[in-house]
Amino acid sequence: MKRSMYAGHVREEHIGRTIVLKGWVSRRRDLGGLIFIDLRDREGVMQLVINPEDVSGDVMATAERLRSEYVIEVEGSVEARQQANDKLATGAVELKVSGLTILNTAKTTPFEIKDGVEVSDDMRLRYRYLDLRRPEMLESFKLRAKTTHVIRNYLDNLGFIDVETPMLTKSTPEGARDYLVPSRISQGHFYALPQSPQITKQLLMNAGFDRYYQIVKCFRDEDLRGDRQPEFTQVDLETSFLSEQEIQDIVEGMIAKVMKDTKGIEVKLPFPRMAYDDAMNHYGSDKPDTRFDMLLQDLTDLVKEVDFKVFSEAQAVKAIVVKGHADDYSRKDIDKLTEFAKQFGAKGLAWLKVVDGAFTGPIAKFLTGVESKLTESLQLEHNDLVLFVADTLEVANNTLGTLRTRIAKELDMIDMSQFHFLWVVDWPMFEWSEEEERYMSAHHPFTLPTQESAHELEGDLAKVRAVAYDIVLNGYELGGGSLRINQKDMQERMFKALGFTKEEASDQFGFLLEAMEYGFPPHGGLAIGLDRLVMLLAGKDNIREVIAFPKNNKASDPMTQAPSLVSEKQLEELQLQIEHHD
């Protein structure tokens, strides 16, 4: 029989109609000779009533066989429920069953198929197809589908062309590790799965496509955390002849449309803009969460003369003030914060409390000479807790930035209903890598340097600034973009600054350099992490919740057991050998 509608769509206007529904048995209850079934499908739950006086013996016998997660087909008439269930969208009606067929049986599931059930992450991933049956999960994927639909329509209406770029591409240095794919035909050679379509989308601008977009899978072999996966999806854009501001305007309009159509929220445009240096100095992060205060305060000059070497000899002394919560933090609690701070390079954490206008704590005695200045500078009041880090400016910023976020979450200071977007601009072109002992691209080596700082490519790389911009939401980097280099001599200077020899640059990027000899237009773009955007829209804290079949923190899939060993025959075809090290 053909399904009449989804179970979750049945309403009072359908009373009196005979309909056919199909779905899963969510729950079965026997009560006073009647059998009640909660039938679940993609759109919700509908109560079925099977009365032995209204059905044949065969139907009743079939009903008695039903267990959770059996797949069934039912026919019956829609009737008003005697006692409505306000918790269900279908709660005013029920289906009086006249026909019932079991389409498939089910084993007892390893966990209940309902929201809020306590199950380990690996168990959920092992039985992901069951986990995805839960209404909460289904809603997240409807939201994801709606988001991509809005994005496609918005960009289509602005004249963007959806172009697919290669999944098998060339491995290039810089950035995260590539996932490599051995070639059977060109033995000893490897493709790489793309970390982004960066170069190919730039080449599309050289081809005259003018406005490109793609919702594309990307791959990075990097350490995982809650908002990272080895394969992820991004909304990728590239444009020709547009300024930094014009690109940002397009992206803001897209985000505003997504927010309105998926959440019913009107966001204020334009988004605020914050210089990279201001973000680091005031928030301790290049992706600041502006939903709460507790900004970093620079006290380096104020405490320079105090008789406390930790402060007086430090390159930077910075602090955050936890307003009105000193009594929430015992000495033991602060010790935990200190150990946390050490994970980010700090040697320790100095602190004081304000009690009835006086400083208390282990460093209070060293600050008597500057107590009034500190009180005025930090606007201190009774029951304030002040946390200090004295170290390099980088360590002080990073440590206090992470402490700021941790404490705000601990004290429930963040309004989780708010969506705070902003642009972080005026980025440094390079960042120093302690591991590599050299400067590396803060974004990628195709980013255009500012006209004012480009001369420093042959001088002090720390002074080179980029025409780059990141879009941030609630402390998460949603995406990043920039204007790109379109002239060969500038691109060669960039490669040289990064330590490439001419031969290395030609070997890795010769095709791009050659393309720049054929009228490459000025261009720029941006990529937004779709998984991360949907995660935040859905109010989740891990992108696994909005990816259908994600990997765990070991980059493996407990369901399929990927990655897995392959046969010797497959290895021989690729002329590969596996060396086992004890």
From Swiss-Prot:
Family that this chain belongs to: Belongs to the class-II aminoacyl-tRNA synthetase family. Type 1 subfamily.
Pfam families in UniProt: GAD, tRNA-synt_2, tRNA_anti-codon
Gene Ontology terms, MF aspect: aspartate-tRNA ligase activity; ATP binding; catalytic activity, acting on a protein; nucleic acid binding; transferase activity
Record-listed ATP binding positions: R220, D221, E222, Q229, E477, G529, L530, D531, R532
Record-listed L-aspartate binding positions: E174, R220, H443, R484
Chain residue ranges for the region called Aspartate: 198-201
Protein name: Aspartate--tRNA ligase
Organism: Streptococcus equi subsp. zooepidemicus (strain MGCS10565)
PANTHER family hit by this protein: ASPARTATE--TRNA LIGASE, MITOCHONDRIAL, ASPARTYL/LYSYL-TRNA SYNTHETASE
Role description: Catalyzes the attachment of L-aspartate to tRNA(Asp) in a two-step reaction: L-aspartate is first activated by ATP to form Asp-AMP and then transferred to the acceptor end of tRNA(Asp).
Segments passing through the bilayer: none
Annotated Gene3D superfamilies: Bira Bifunctional Protein, Domain 2, GAD-like domain, Nucleic acid-binding proteins
Single GO biological process annotation from the record: aspartyl-tRNA aminoacylation
Enzymatic reactions: tRNA(Asp) + L-aspartate + ATP = L-aspartyl-tRNA(Asp) + AMP + diphosphate
Compartments, record wording: Cytoplasm
Enzyme class, first EC level, given as a word: ligase
One Gene Ontology CC term in the entry: cytoplasm
EC number: 6.1.1.12
Binding partners and assembly: Homodimer.
Keywords: Aminoacyl-tRNA synthetase, ATP-binding, Cytoplasm, Ligase, Nucleotide-binding, Protein biosynthesis
InterPro entries: Aa-tRNA-synt_II (IPR004364), aa-tRNA-synth_II (IPR006195), aa-tRNA-synth_II/BPL/LPL (IPR045864), Asp-tRNA-ligase_1 (IPR004524), Asp-tRNA-ligase_1_N (IPR047089), Asp/Asn-tRNA-synth_IIb (IPR002312), AspRS_core (IPR047090), GAD-like_sf (IPR004115)
